[in-house]
Amino acid sequence: MRSPISAASRRLPTDRLPDRLTWSLAALGVTGLAAATIASPDRAGSAASQDWPPFVLVAGLLLIGLVADDDGLFAALGHQLARTTKNGPLLFCGAALICGAVTAVLNLDTSVAFLTPVLVYTARSRGGGEAPLLYGCLLLSNAGSLFLPGSNLTNLIVLGHRHLSGELFLSHAWAAALAALVTTALVVAVLEHKEVRTTRTESPASHRPVVGLGFVAVAAAAVLVIVLRSPALPVCGVGVFSIGVRLAKKRDRLSHVSDVLGLPVLVGLFGVAVALGTLGRAWSGPTVLLSHLDLVGTAAFAAVASVLVNNLPAASLLAAQAPIHP
């Protein structure tokens, strides 16, 4: 029988999207991809070559996250944190570190999908409110996505042409990423200070994970993301192999794996990203506009574009051409 945490972790963000909306996005993406390919095959090919690695990488990381979750690794983290840390502020700090680490290594999508239910269950098992850990996980997963290229698909789309290794990327981004993580944690802690101060005298029952395929897959992904300049295919290979073993042993279902991946959403976003990337290569407007903006203006413009069309298509559009100024 699956634990409450494991069962809850199946309710991923994509599960709440209406089927019509999901498949409409997929249809829009396929249509956009086809239109871009017909209109300008060369530009569409260039956009696709820039955009495919992030989507392949996140698919691999989600598969690895699924295997790790089945082994109880994430649930064990939550249980151990609740057992060893009775002090509310220390629990929140530990949760922030877990969110940052999982996001950095396994991508923000994996962190949100699998850690959110774990931390909510952890909070409830202590008798306290789940708001600090719930909001903290969602916000810290985004704040912690600046440490490595694979932590956020946008990183790979915008900087893909530079082919930076994870180690080199980390050497440049660690200070800003750490500042974002700490600042976000402080804001959540201040806003939810009453719940953060909750303490507990009793410890929840222990939860023993299976240290096996999931642990090995996570470790392999961490090494590949940090060492390789283009880790998408190797990481995806690890994910496919890991989930293939589970399917062969009938410990999971193909339909469940498909639900976790959210294939219609990935296909739709990829198609829209390629279409906008093709547009960005044919039209210099976005690049010229960015060249006239300072740091704050660039951030504001990128934020608005991300809200309007999603961050991935926006990144493909705005990074279609090399910026005039860094």
Give the positions of each predicted feature.
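Hydrophobic alpha-helical transmembrane segments
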Residues: 55-56, 89-97, 111, 134-135, ...
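Juxtamembrane and boundary regions of transmembrane helices in multi-pass small-molecule transporters
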Residues: 128, 167-209, 213
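Helix-loop-helix module between adjacent transmembrane segments
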Residues: 65, 98-107, 140-146, 176-184
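Transmembrane helical segments that form the transport core of multi-pass membrane transport proteins
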Residues: 66, 78, 218-321
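Membrane-interfacial helix-loop connectors
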Residues: 42, 103-105, 109, 113-136, ...
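C-terminal ends of transmembrane helices
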Residues: 66-80, 120-125, 187-199, 244-257
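Interfacial loop-to-helix junctions that mark the boundaries of transmembrane helices
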Residues: 13-22, 43-54, 164-176, 203-208, ...
